Amino acid sequence: MDPVVLTARSVLCEPGRWIEGGGLVLHGGRVRAVLDSPGAVARAGLTLRDLGDVLLTPGLVNAHAHLELGTLAGALPPDEGFVAWVEALIASKAHDGDEDFARAVAVGAERLLAGGTTCVGDVDSTGAAGEVCGGGGLRARIYHEVLDAGDERRTAGALERLSNRPAGGAGRYEGIAPHAPYTVSPTLLAACGKLQRESGQACSIHWAETEEEAHWMERGEGEFARLLNHSPGVRGLDAIEAAGLLGAGTSLVHANHTAPGERERIARAGAVVVHCPGTHEFFGRSPFDFRAWMEAGVNLALGTDSLASNDDLDMRKEMALVRASAGLEPADVWSMATLGGARAVGLAGSVGALVEGAWADLVAWPWSGGGPAAALDALTAGELRPVAVLISGHPLREGDA
């Protein structure tokens, strides 16, 4: 297929790069050049594909989801606390089968696309995500989840799952997800670290989500004793670092309860912290300290988590929650939902920005005009609904969001 120039009224390539009357050269599913003026478009001499009065942006990147848990939407209230919620999740999930999980992933992928998300970091414990994601649809980093709850009898099975994880495919990238330092034994965590070093695949791990986690990790105390048998006797971040997993290829999900100096350690290591605003609100947690993380120099990303702890899979809502709760600049919030997410899933330069060499994963939003400040304000307030979503330059949704 010959190169084409995709034009629109305005293009937000990334925060700080705004184009009026220009366009993007697309070829082979990627952005081959950014044309910053009508004159540059004319000089390109290529076939034009004009989207009209729209604002063109990169697709949003959902850095943390559990699409398979769509089977539990609205079924698990948080009233009795986090550990009780986990117990209910385990019991409820046991009643679902492969078809249920596959259906949940497919429906979840459609919901993400409808809200302008074109790439997701999806934690997969059932194998369902690999059957649905990619292949010209939603782009996905599929994190294959393992845990053994400190039970050596389960470690071998978890290691086998890691060694037998499928290869990536079109629009699908494989990753590793040791569930959390409190549910993964030192042996299994070390194996994940070794595998990440050898494969270069991205890693996602839940960390510091609740105070109960720290109580269990360090002292073997608290409600986690109902679920687990052996406390590691160390802080979670120390366990992650000892396994070789504290680095640029790792996403630390939640990060709500930290000790002095841990933010700086994470910044030096280059790991990404993923905040899930909807889940945070679901459990009624204290405000997430965005500014402390930003001042420490940590890369931040946003995720929806699952429908078991959120009422939607809409990154527009997640951005709006951050705006309402933290009072951050719209450009910073947009960066978390695009550039930050791309770093989290290990696809920086390929998704999350409209730059030369990136995949042409684009969203067109209705736009009557205005500058970048107005655009970022509207985008991060959740005021706009996509009119078209493209993956690798091919329309997937038009006018039905």
PLM feature segments, named:
Residues 1-43, 394:
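N-terminal metal-binding scaffold of metallo-dependent hydrolase/deaminase domains
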Residues 55-56, 73-136, 159-168:
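Alpha-helical scaffold segments that flank or form the walls of functional sites
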Residues 66, 125-126, 145-149, 179-181, ...:
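Active-site beta-loop-alpha junctions enriched in small/polar residues
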Residues 71-103, 136-137, 141-144, 210-249, ...:
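Active-site gating loops and adjacent loop-to-helix segments of metal-dependent hydrolytic enzymes
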Residues 131-134, 158-272, 284-300, 349-352:
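Histidine/acidic residue-rich metal-binding segments in metalloenzymes
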Residues 242-245, 286-368, 387:
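His/Asp/Glu-enriched, well-ordered alpha-helical/loop segment
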Residues 359-401:
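C-terminal cap of metal-dependent C-N hydrolases
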